[in-house]
Amino acid sequence: MAKGSGKTTFKDTVTAYERLRREIAAGRYAPVYLLMGEEGYFIDRIADQLAGTVLTEAERDFNQIVVYGKDTDEGTIINYARQMPMMGRYEVVIVKEAQSLRKPEQLSLYTAAPSPSTILVVCYKGKSLDKRTQLYKHIVQKGEVLESVRPRDYEITAWLGDFVQSKGCTIEPKALGMLTDHLGTDISRISNELAKLLTFLPEGTKRITAQHIEDNIGISKDFNNFELTKAISEKNMARAMLIADHFRRNPKDNPLTVTLSALFTHFQRIFIVNYKRWEIRHKNVPAPSDAELSALLKLPNPFFLNEYK
């Protein structure tokens, strides 16, 4: 049972998501699921898993109902949830876009005493339900709550590495940098691009390279923000200007706001490294290890430290 207290982090979201996936795969279902938050990826994956595994294909015709918040109302949802299943153990009711319901709090009339033969899935995207409401409190007590938080820039690469590993592959650091540089922290978009990439890779490929990314996703391995900050660190002005000129000529593929964000983060890290050097010289502070410095700079891997030393 999910207990909603305190501010949820992306790490909390991933932990809760993985636990729910295991519980559902094992057939241990809750009577009510509240899947809410800004990151739609985890909400969709849990809803899809429940839709595809609780009932057999034959049972779904009679016992699985999918409605959309903008096209239904709370009373209709409650009536569906109170129906008895026909020729099956469960009635599955999935409410998508529940944030569009006019009065979602009215669902508390059902969640106060949910039917043990119904699995109600409430997908509340883009924001979180008010945790002070009776609806939220009921579901925390009687069901499962997944609060889906978007990752920060420095969190996405670790998740991405784990995601690729779960598919039986690894990915080189430069390829990771290219993906996150181009696609940002949009997990749904990144996972879709990787899913397509994995279908195109030669059979037996176990490591995704920068060349694979360029050939199959269309992100240049030579002209991207990852290469721009690397050229700046190496004081290779000609290379940096060449990349900047490429960006100027291809603004659609290289948005200025993304580049500015990458440059800000890069110089912020350089400042932190130089401040640490000053502390070592003037305050006799012990030098941090590579792992400690990597964590301080919020780098996904100590591999990237050479850019800042």
Where are these regions (language model features)?
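C-terminal alpha-helical interaction modules of replication/initiation AAA+ assemblies
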Residues: 224-227, 239-309
